[in-house]
Structure formats: structure tokens, C-alpha cells
Amino acid sequence: MILNSSTEDSIKRIQDDCPKAGRHNYIFVMIPTLYSIIFVVGIFGNSLVVIVIYFYMKLKTVASVFLLNLALADLCFLLTLPLWAVYTAMEYRWPFGNYLCKIASASVSFNLYASVFLLTCLSIDRYLAIVHPMKSRLRRTMLVAKVTCIIIWLLAGLASLPTIIHRNVFFIENTNITVCAFHYESQNSTLPVGLGLTKNILGFLFPFLIILTSYTLIWKALKKAYEIQKNKPRNDDIFKIIMAIVLFFFFSWVPHQIFTFLDVLIQLGIIHDCKIADIVDTAMPITICLAYFNNCLNPLFYGFLGKKFKKYFLQLLKYIPPKAKSHSSLSTKMSTLSYRPSENGSSSTKKSAPCTEVE
């Protein structure tokens, strides 16, 4: 969608140079359906994650704090998803007013940054817990985890401020519809560049590099531990899990980030072809479904790596109430071996200790 401003009114009036871009009947049916599925699955799954972690597991570990906040961030986003489903089903006609336009848009942006930052911190926590279990004891505390989550929520809110400021309701004169969209004045070309690059770099590239580095180091440490303890059979599931975590994150977000970058080029007028604009506007909601559906499954995905999480989750599904006493924290297959150098410089392996527990 290429928008040009014409007149100013209570609702700003603009022109769309490519009015048919992204407007296909199958999009107006398929995307609301996918949004509805994401909403139902996401609300159900993330609500159960919150209940399991808070009431059954008693929020005892650092990783459980990150997972709880991840689920809460997803729930905040999911609550606005029906608005986007209606918006798309109405062929991109926004009936909810300017305030809800800003709030719903900011929720999408907030969830992107909060979830990515939390996953990044979770990967760092896994690295410290598995590779440096003894050294990281004093740093991996509940207080540090809670303060980190507060900082993440503040940073995600700060990163979403431009969306609150610049996302508005506009009336497109040549199509006679009201949309909730970004609109950039031609002379203010630095804004879309800044927003697009922030989303690409801060919302994907840097976090992915940190996640990739963390799990690569975990991979190497566990591999070395198995080589040292040759009499112990190698559990390849550990390495499959690590590979799945990295690939899951990468392929969930790469399509959306690519089309976000192309959309910035269109908004800047670098790309003028309406055929390309149609491809981008058609693909964008599909990539959003992919990214945010996987995003909403993350708490379940990470949680089910832990045996105790699975146990309590199944208990909850069977309506078995949590016991009054506190439960010990989650552990996963990645915590069956921890690796650390001994004091004399040689390498040693040991069975998992509480400091290596993943959730």
C-alpha cells in the first residue's frame, strides 16, 4: 500500500497509489481464520502455561520467570487479535477508532520486542546454567531475573512508542475506506528507515546472533562432556532440541523481517511497482501469522522441554489441583549433563544440579 497525503481533516485524507495491493478475497477469508485459530490456541495454551508456572511450580527458577513473562506478553497481544481479524475480514476497513488503532498496533510491536528479548535472555540463562553452573550461581537469582524482566518490558514499551505516535486512522479517498496504518510524509524519510531498521536489527538480527551463540556454546560444552565421559551413551535428543530452538526462531521471523524491509522501501518510494507492492501487502499478513503463531507457541515449546512442566501441565488438563507444598523447579534433557573446568584445569562432568535446571 503506497499512501500519499492530500488534505487534513478530523481524519487525515490520503491517496493510495496502489489501491488494489494486497486486496484479495482469499486473504480476507484465510487471514481472519488463521487469526481466530491463533487466538484460541494461544489464549488456551498461554493461560495454561501461566497457571502451571505460577500455581503448580511456584515460580521457583530463573527460567520460569522468563517463561511466565513470555506467556503474559503473548496474552497481551492475543487480546487484540480479534480486532485484526475483523479488520481483515472487512477488507481492511478499520471501524474501531483511532485509540484502538494505536493500542492494537502497539500491542503487536510490544509483543515482538518483549518476546524476542525474553527468548534472548532465556538463551543466555541456559548458557550460564549449563556451561558455567557454579560461577553463575550468584548472578542467576530470582531478583536478577525479575529486574531483567522489568527492564525488558520497559524497553519493549519504549521501542513501541513510535508505533503509538505514528500509527493512525486514515481515510483513503480513491478507495473510500478508513484504514489503520502508518503514513510517512515525503520529507520525513528518516522515520520509516529508523523504524524498519530497528525492527530488523533490534527485533531480530542482534537477538538471533546472541541466541545462536548461546546455544552453539551449549552444544560444544555438552559435546565435550560426552567425549570426556565416554562410558555414558550419547543422547542425541539434546542436540536435536538445540537445533530445533535455533531453527524455530530463525524461520519464524525471517520471512516477516524480509517483507518488513521491502515495505519500508515501498513507503520511501524506492520501489514504485504496484505489482511488487501487491506481493508485499499480500505476503505481510501471512508472515505475521507465521511469526506470531510460533511466538505464541514458544512458552509451550520451551515449557515442554521440562519433564516436571509436562507432568503439571497434564495434571492441570485432568483438573488435578496443585499441592500445597512448593515444587522443585523444572529440569530438561539439556540439564542431564553440565560441563565446567575443574580447579586444576582439567575438565570434569557431573550430574545435573539445581543450578543447571532449565525451567
UniProtKB/Swiss-Prot annotation:
Keywords: Cell membrane, Disulfide bond, G-protein coupled receptor, Glycoprotein, Lipoprotein, Membrane, Palmitate, Phosphoprotein, Receptor, Transducer, Transmembrane, Transmembrane helix. Residues 56-61, 126-141, 217-239, 305-359 are cytoplasmic. Residues 1-25, 90-98, 166-190, 269-278 are extracellular. It comes from the Eukaryota. A lipid is attached at residue 355 (S-palmitoyl cysteine). Interacts with MAS1. Interacts with ARRB1. Interacts with FLNA (via filamin repeat 21); increases PKA-mediated phosphorylation of FLNA. This is Type-1 angiotensin II receptor. It comes from Sus scrofa.
